[in-house]
């Protein structure tokens, strides 16, 4: 073999090794990400025409009233079949004035490519498997602002949502008076159309929440840049309550929001629910109709809850003598 041939062969081998070490970008994934970047910009810019140029536009009208501080997509996977594709996507958004960090939810998008210009467009956008719906997945979102609250409703009148805002605005000062430790002193309330719609937001069967007037969802542990907790109302059960009961429910759930930063995996349910009940009924002249789950016999059913201290149980970390909120989602039954 001549010297020039050896040199050429070595250069070929080097180039092959170098190429093998590179990760080639998926052009379809890159194109889909570009479409979704334009879609996100249209949402934040309230530009329906620009949104429609990226594909199906019905959802734009559903969420147009929601006060958004951030909205973005991240494509995690694309499965292409000819001129169609299915994309796994993370949607991240923040509600202005309430979310310190983004809500992150998984979505499944179906797209198609125009044969004329080769551009991809969104045909459908739905929650991924085992992910809950967002309010705008269920229809047009109406928004009512209170002094200490933001109420988002679907299938509800503005008058009804104003009633929820008024209740929440009374709940926040009542909770702050009982729980003086730092919290945002504002709440987000979601009011869907029905029990089934509530279950859709939570990504769970409706049977799990039948008879539950409301639940509060949020991250445990008090992460600094976390999304705001959501109080999610079951309108079917909530509508059966009287004036006092409705106020107690919102105050009870707001207590969970306020105490969220002190939540740990060791928090007993009776402790978090007992304190929330105490705050809910505190100024009503009434006592809760029944004790929370696993309420200890040694604890009084009236008076200040601090007269009943949690005890340490064998094999578990000590429970707090402050009164933290429950983990994830806990509801107030009718």
What are these regions (language model features)?
Residues 1-22:
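Secretory targeting and sorting signals
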Residues 218-224, 244-245, 263-333:
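Acidic/His/Gly-enriched intrinsically disordered linker/tail segments
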Residues 37-44, 56, 169-184, 255-264, ...:
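Sec-exported extracytoplasmic/periplasmic mature domains
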Residues 97-141:
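Short beta-strand edge/turn micro-motifs at domain boundaries
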Residues 82-84, 104-106, 117, 138, ...:
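Extracytoplasmic
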Residues 24-33, 37-84:
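Short solvent-exposed beta->alpha transition segments
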Residues 145-268:
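Juxtacatalytic substrate-recognition/specificity segment
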Residues 62-106, 235-239:
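Surface-exposed, charged secondary-structure patches
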């Amino acid at each position: 073999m001549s010297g020039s041939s050896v040199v050429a062969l070595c250069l070929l081998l080097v180039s092959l090794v170098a190429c093998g070490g590179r990760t080639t970008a998926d052009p379809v994934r890159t194109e889909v990400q570009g479409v979704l970047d334009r879609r996100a910009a249209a949402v934040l810019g309230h530009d329906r025409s620009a949104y429609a140029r990226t594909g199906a536009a019905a959802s734009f009208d559903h969420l147009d009233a929601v006060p958004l501080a951030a909205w973005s997509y991240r494509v995690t996977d694309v499965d292409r079949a000819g001129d169609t594709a299915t994309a796994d996507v993370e949607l991240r958004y923040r509600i202005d004035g309430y979310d310190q960090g983004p809500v992150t939810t998984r979505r499944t998008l179906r797209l198609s490519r125009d044969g004329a210009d080769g551009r991809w467009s969104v045909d459908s956008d739905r929650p991924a498997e085992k992910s809950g719906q967002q309010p705008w997945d269920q229809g047009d979102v109406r928004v009512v602002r209170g002094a200490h609250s933001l109420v988002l409703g679907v299938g509800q009148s503005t008058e009804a949502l104003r009633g929820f805002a008024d209740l929440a605005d009374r709940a926040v000062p009542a909770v702050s008076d009982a729980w003086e430790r730092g919290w945002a002193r504002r709440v987000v309330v979601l009011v869907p159309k029905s029990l089934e719609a509530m279950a859709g937001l939570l990504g769970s069967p409706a049977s799990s929440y039948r008879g539950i007037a409301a639940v509060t969802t949020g991250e445990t542990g008090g992460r600094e840049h976390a999304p705001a907790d959501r109080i999610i109302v079951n309108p079917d059960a909530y509508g059966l309550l009287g004036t006092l009961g409705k106020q107690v429910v919102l105050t009870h759930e707001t207590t969970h929001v306020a105490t969220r930063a002190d939540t740990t995996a060791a928090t007993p349910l009776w402790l978090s629910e007992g304190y929330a009940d105490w705050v809910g009924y505190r100024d009503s002249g009434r006592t809760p109709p029944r004790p929370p789950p696993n309420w200890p016999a040694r604890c009084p059913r009236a008076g200040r809850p601090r007269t009943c201290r949690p005890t340490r149980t064998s094999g578990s970390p000590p429970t707090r003598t402050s009164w933290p909120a429950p983990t994830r989602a806990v509801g107030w039954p009718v």
